[in-house]
Amino acid sequence: MANVAVVGSQWGDEGKGKIVDWLSSRADVVVRFQGGHNAGHTLVIGDVEYKLSLLPSGVVRPGKLSVIGNGVVVDPWALLREIDTIRAKGVTVTPETLLVAENCALILPLHGAVDRAREEARGASKIGTTGRGIGPAYEDKVARRAIRLCDLADDRVLEDKVDHLLFHHNALLRGLGAAEIDKAELMAQIAEVAPRILPYAAVVWQRLDEAKRARKRILFEGAQGAMLDVDHGTYPFVTSSNTVAGNAAAGSGMGPGVVGYVLGITKAYTTRVGSGPFPTELTDATGEQLGLRGREFGTVTGRKRRCGWFDAVMVRQAIKTGGITGIALTKLDVLDGFSELKVCTGYRYQGEIIHHLPAGQTAQAAVEPVYETFQGWSESTRGARSWADLPATAVKYVRRIEELVEAPVTLLSTSPERDDTILMRDPFED
C-alpha cells in the first residue's frame, strides 16, 4: 500500500477535482497541504454538486478523516462558510471528521485589503491575484508575524500580535493611499470567529502519524499546479507556496518518505488563468473553441481561462521538479472533432532549440513553441472506459505524450463523470 499525493502539472485547473474524488473514495485520510481558498474544484456525487476551495475533497464522503495541514493558510470565515454550504447539502462536518492544524497561519480581513490595494497599484503589471489575501498571509508567515490558529486561544499574546501586524500593514496601506485597518474592528472580528473555528484545531502531525502507523491510506491533495510553484513556476506569475509534491511532507508535518506515489493531473491541452507567460497560447478561433468545449471558467472566480495546445516541455519539467510518478490525462474528449492537433516539443529561443522553460521572466516571454502535428479524430471519446473504446489516432496521441513527458499515463479521463475513467495502474498499490 502506498500513500498518494495528487498535484497539478500545469497552471492548475487540470481537473484534479474528479480524480481526487475518485481516489478519496478509496482513501482513509485526505490532507490539504498548501494554498488557501484561492483555487477551487467541483465534485459531483450522485445528483449533488459540491464546490470546494479550502476543504479537502474527502469531507463529502462519510467515514473519511479530512485534514487541513500546517502548510495551508486558512481564512476562518471562508472555511466556516464552506462548511455551512456543504452542511446545507446534507454533509456532516464535525471536529471529529475535520482537523485543522493548530499551527497553520490565518488569513485575516487585512490580508485581503492589502492584496487588493497592491494589485490595483500595479496597474498594467498585475500578477493576477484573486485578491483573497493568500500572498500577504504567506508573507506574514515567513516574516514571523503571522497569527496562527493556536493564537486565538491565547489572549495574552493575541493583542500584541495584532499590534505588530497592524504596525506593518497599515504602513503599507498608507503608502498605497488605501484605508487603514481599525484595530478595534479587527479584534472584534477575531473574537467573534475564534470560538467557532477553535474546535477544529488539532495536533495534526500527531494524528497523521497515528494514521500512518495504523496503515491507513493517506491521500495528499495539492492545489493549483506545478507551474504556479513559487520556486519552480513562471515567477513572479505564481502563487505564494510550493505546489509540488515535495511540500506534502512539510505542509502536513510528516517525513519526506511518506508519499509512495505522486500523480500529476495533466490536461490534454493547456490552460492558464490570469497574467504570465504561456508559450502555446492560442488567441484565435481554435483557442476559443477549446475554451467553449472545455468550459474553461474558474470554479472560484469565474474568470475565463486562456487556452492553448499541449506543452510537453512544460509538463516534462513539472514531472522532473515535482517527482511525479505517473500522470492522469484529463479532458481528452474536448479534443474530439479537431482535424489537427499540435503538441509543443521544444522552444525556439535566441536562434536555438531548447527543451526547458527558462527561469528568467524575459526569456519565458520570448520563447516560441516548436510543434509536432498530429492527425485528429472525428469519433467521440466521451465516456470511454477502456482503450478499446478509443479511436486509434487518440491512442497514438496519448502514447506520444507519454514518450514526450517521460512518464506513463496512469489514468485517462474522458468526461467529467467520475466513472468515465480508464485505469492503467492503481496509485495506492505498491
From Swiss-Prot:
A GO term from the CC aspect: cytoplasm
Pathway: Purine metabolism; AMP biosynthesis via de novo pathway; AMP from IMP: step 1/2
Residues at which GTP binds: 12-18, 40-42, 305, 331-333, 413-415
Alphabetized UniProt keyword annotations: Cytoplasm, GTP-binding, Ligase, Magnesium, Metal-binding, Nucleotide-binding, Purine biosynthesis
Free-text comment on the cofactor: Binds 1 Mg(2+) ion per subunit.
GO molecular function, one term: GTP binding
Gene3D superfamilies for the chain: Adenylosuccinate Synthetase, subunit A, domain 1, Adenylosuccinate Synthetase, subunit A, domain 2, Adenylosuccinate Synthetase, subunit A, domain 3
Protein's GO biological process: 'de novo' AMP biosynthetic process; IMP metabolic process
Residue numbers binding Mg(2+): 13, 40
InterPro entries from the UniProt entry: Adenylosuccin_syn_GTP-bd, Adenylosuccin_syn_Lys_AS, Adenylosuccinate_synth_dom1, Adenylosuccinate_synth_dom2, Adenylosuccinate_synth_dom3, Adenylosuccinate_synthetase, P-loop_NTPase
Cofactor section: Mg(2+)
Top-rank taxon: Bacteria
Family statement drawn from the similarity comment of this UniProt entry: Belongs to the adenylosuccinate synthetase family.
Protein name as catalogued: Adenylosuccinate synthetase
Protein source organism: Rhodospirillum centenum (strain ATCC 51521 / SW)
Gene coding for it: purA
